[in-house]
Amino acid sequence: MKHIARKRFGQHFLTDGAMIEAIVDAIGPRPGQAMVEIGPGLAALTQPLVERLGQLTVIELDRDLAARLRAHPQLVVIESDVLKVDFAQVAQALTTTKLRVVGNLPYNISTPILFHLLNFIDVIEDQHFMLQKEVIDRMVAGPCTAAYGRLSVMLQWRYAMENVLLVPPESFEPPPRVNSAVVRMVPHVNPAAVDGHLLSELVQVAFSQRRKLLRHTLGQWLQQKGYADEFDVQRRAEEVPVAEYLALALKLATHSQAASH
């Protein structure tokens, strides 16, 4: 029975054989590696991946697709919403310390998935995701560009990232209205030891009104926190490099510790 793509899951299925091969080559799976695929769909990537790996764990929310995938002897199927999956437990079950994570992420929840995975970065070796190209542009953007924002800062803090492949709409069934691309994400070995919640709040405040100078947003927020050290708020959020946001978060944490003693 033919599976009909469900709009509520944001399903677009990859059907171009040459493109599938190029994506699998970019991922570079090797026999015995512990890999998890998010949203395998109709197994376009799953089949060539499992042929190279020998075994693959897949996370699929769609009940019909999960049932179909269970018939494959080399697949371990987790039927779940990926946002509820504990990747540390998955690594434990696979008796490994590091997972490779791949997937053609549903466009409507790609950002929440990326933030969810941040919680499990210690058990992740690398990530390869197909996403809307516009999302990847935001992930890898540098300061002083329109694409630079909260996503850029939060992800660049923890990952080295690159856009490795462009995937045109005609590679899919049904074709999406947007261009897609594949991003490679490799966790930094020694990221800045910043409090993630504090950084997230700081960056959210900074980018809450992109067009305004930071003194209207971040400046006031820093004042409320009783922080009076040097930080140039006579510029816009997009003009501040990642390293400066990290340095500010570190100083803020030290300041609030000192204030509470």
Swiss-Prot record:
It catalyses: adenosine(1518)/adenosine(1519) in 16S rRNA + 4 S-adenosyl-L-methionine = N(6)-dimethyladenosine(1518)/N(6)-dimethyladenosine(1519) in 16S rRNA + 4 S-adenosyl-L-homocysteine + 4 H(+). Its EC number is 2.1.1.182. It is found in: Cytoplasm. Coiled coil: none annotated. GO terms for molecular function: 16S rRNA (adenine(1518)-N(6)/adenine(1519)-N(6))-dimethyltransferase activity; RNA binding. The keyword Metal-binding does not apply. Keywords: Cytoplasm, Methyltransferase, RNA-binding, rRNA processing, S-adenosyl-L-methionine, Transferase. Specifically dimethylates two adjacent adenosines (A1518 and A1519) in the loop of a conserved hairpin near the 3'-end of 16S rRNA in the 30S particle. May play a critical role in biogenesis of 30S subunits. Belongs to the class I-like SAM-binding methyltransferase superfamily. rRNA adenine N(6)-methyltransferase family. RsmA subfamily. This is Ribosomal RNA small subunit methyltransferase A. The gene is rsmA.
